[in-house]
Amino acid sequence: MNKTRPGPARCVMVLGTTSGAGKSWLATALCRYYSNQGLKVAPFKAQNMSNNARVVAAPGEQFGEIGSAQYFQALAARAVPDVRMNPLLLKPEADTKSQVVLLGQVSDELSQLPWRGRSQRVWPQIAAALDALRAENDVVVIEGAGSPAEINLHASDVVNMRVARHAEARCLLVTDIDRGGAFAHLFGTWALLPEEERALIAGFVLNKFRGDEALLAPAPQMLQDKTGVPVVATIPMQWNHGLPEEDGVFDMRSTAVGAVHTRIAVVAYPRISNLDEFQPLKNVPGVRLSWARSPADVEGADWIVLPGSKATAADLAWLRAQGLDAAIAAHAARGGRVLGVCGGLQMLGEALIDTVGVDGNGPGLGLLPLVTSFEATKTVRPTRQCFGAVQGAWRHLAGVAVQGYEIHHGQTAQHPAMAASGDVARELMPGLAWQNPAGNVLGLYLHGLFEDAAVLRALFGADAPTLDAVFEGLAAGIARHFEPRALDALAAQ
């Protein structure tokens, strides 16, 4: 779509009173709503802290990483995702350590800097990325992070009100009313902002409301009388809006549609990554998805899934400390299905070898006769591959082509000593996927398996709702629940 308006794009920004207030899904809904109005739209989030990342286009015919939320927002906007949409991505590796990704590429230098020093270094690149998107689009939908009123962080802010001021954005402040204290959250956040920043708040949004909306009166009008800012939307609770959660382990309520025939337990280790790729399983009829943190959590499971990890050796040690290693081994010995993705694949092998200080050494779970060597260079690329002659429990994947992506430091191969004795894993994709001789343990580097419709049909004989249908539903929902003309006024020139 071509730009339809002269001059830089109007910016609409979604701020929240807290983390988890609903910024990401609302920004996604706005992207599709404005795109449906015939406008050229792009998403933007200056800084994201998440181990959920996607591979997108980067300058110089390269590929880079951005947060998953901005990737999905770009799709909602009918835009091609690129690294400018999330110029700074922080990927936590420990409680006090993050890998810094600037414009899609890992920066070892920035990763070593303290947060306050780093923020001043990266602001010029953040501002340039936003300015470039504004020059190319009619509307840029900006997502903030956490709360804009964290007064201890205000001087080093690069993601909330500094962005709002730079973009002269019209801001929505959203709160989770289901938590309680919504009006205090809204007023307190507004009151803590400097006067010039309060002026950028165009409307308050009450999210996750349950009950009779009439019972809110007279609070919305009282809040407007105190602040001059109207409540422009009251949005009902959505237990499953269909989008992956941006951070943490997503809500598992209502994960089975119809009678349960497949129980899938996903191991939730501390540094789990790319967990959003399992979101489509929540919508597959008959599938019950659950998180596993103890042996009791995998009892009765048909599948056990080891997802990606930002700290494979440390998460494997955690898994052993919980006793999950024995539970997984017993499940596999009974013929139960085990799936490892990226870091999970590495854990399933015989050994982890780290000579460059990326992750750590240690023995694997020994369910695949493979060995992984960690490298300083990170593999980041989209990948389309076809499964080879898959056998056993995963045989329905044979011949299925998958469009996915790779994000990993490790390189995995057959264990030389075991191969010499005839214990060889069946390679299903060159350098990407392997299966044990019994056929029930599968490991692969390729992320995005369950986001592929062909895979869902092969494994479950069913389709999940398409992302496009999810985006349309979100856009229709905000059109119903915002005050008339409020959305159009936000994006007006």
UniProtKB/Swiss-Prot annotation:
Residues 261-455 form the GATase cobBQ-type domain. InterPro entries: Class_I_gatase-like, CobQ/CobB/MinD/ParA_Nub-bd_dom, CobQ_GATase1, CobQ_N, CobQ_synth, GATase_3, P-loop_NTPase. It comes from the Bacteria. Keywords: Cobalamin biosynthesis, Glutamine amidotransferase. Gene3D superfamilies: 3.40.50.880, P-loop containing nucleotide triphosphate hydrolases. Pathway: Cofactor biosynthesis; adenosylcobalamin biosynthesis. Catalyzes amidations at positions B, D, E, and G on adenosylcobyrinic A,C-diamide. NH(2) groups are provided by glutamine, and one molecule of ATP is hydrogenolyzed for each amidation. This is Cobyric acid synthase. It comes from Acidovorax sp. (strain JS42).
